[in-house]
Design a protein with these regions (language model features):
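Phosphate/pyrophosphate-binding loops at sites that engage ATP/ADP/AMP, CoA/4′-phosphopantetheine
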Residues: 1, 181-191
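Short beta-strand-loop/turn "lid" adjacent to the catalytic site in phosphate-handling enzymes
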Residues: 1-25
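Glycine-rich phosphate-binding loops at beta-strand->alpha-helix junctions
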Residues: 10, 191-208
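Phosphate-binding/catalytic loop of phosphoryl-transfer enzymes
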Residues: 14-19, 34-114
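Generic structural signal for well-ordered alpha-helical scaffold segments
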Residues: 59-64, 177-185
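Conserved ATP-utilizing enzyme core subdomain
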Residues: 90-181
Length: 208
């Protein structure tokens, strides 16, 4: 047995060649009496990678196991949304498409006593603000070619202060949808199968 431990990222700057995580892998190994493998992000950056996302290898395993038609894609909608695209050669490409749940959750916490928009129901009762949405989408990150990664500290919801709860949720949820669509549109051959994972897969507004 062994433990793969990636820690909790507090700062991620691959362009500056560093990524910092909380967590003591040596202590975890002593406490559990188990071999612990860690520093995935740091080692990937040292070897020329972006240090994120970490999920593509697992996604590749899943797509192979179900013998999906290729090319195919798996979208993980966590705090940040990331996409794994598997080509017909089984080669994989992985990158962050944009915000997933992070901005929505931050908005909910700032306006309510809830941690998230359960099922996307609040977003479904609102309307996205196109002007504010376009300001978000003007971020050059979304036109940048992969490989690329996002740090949550690069995201903020300050442009939403004029909106009510429902419209803010709808705007941020639509931002997640739009940036995923932009990422999928960057592939020459569209995926024949798309699988969803992460908490965002339960958000009916995003799915619709």
């Amino acid at each position: 047995d062994l433990i793969g431990f990636h820690g909790q990222t507090i700062l991620h700057k691959p362009q500056s060649k560093y990524s910092i995580q909380l967590g003591d892998s040596k202590l975890l190994s002593r406490v559990t009496n188990t071999i612990v493998i860690s520093n995935f992000r740091e080692n990937d950056i040292i070897n020329g990678g972006q240090g994120a996302p970490l999920t593509p290898i697992y996604h590749q395993f899943i797509l192979k196991k179900i013998q999906s038609k290729l090319p195919s894609a798996m979208i993980n909608i966590g705090g940040i949304a990331n996409i794994t695209y598997m080509e017909e050669s089984n080669k994989i490409i992985g990158f962050d498409s944009g915000p997933g749940n992070y901005l929505i959750d931050e908005w909910m916490r700032s306006k309510t006593d809830k941690e998230f928009d359960s099922g996307g129901l609040i977003a479904k009762s609102g309307h996205p603000n196109e002007g504010i949405l376009n300001k978000f989408l003007s971020n050059p990150y979304y036109k940048k070619k992969f490989p690329k990664t996002l740090d949550v500290k690069d995201l903020n919801s300050q442009n939403l202060n004029t909106l009510n709860l429902e419209d803010g949720c709808a705007t941020l949820s639509m931002l997640t949808v739009k940036t995923i669509c932009l990422a999928l549109g960057s592939f020459k051959n569209p995926p024949k199968l798309i699988l969803l994972s992460g908490g965002g897969r339960k958000n009916k507004y995003i799915l619709d």
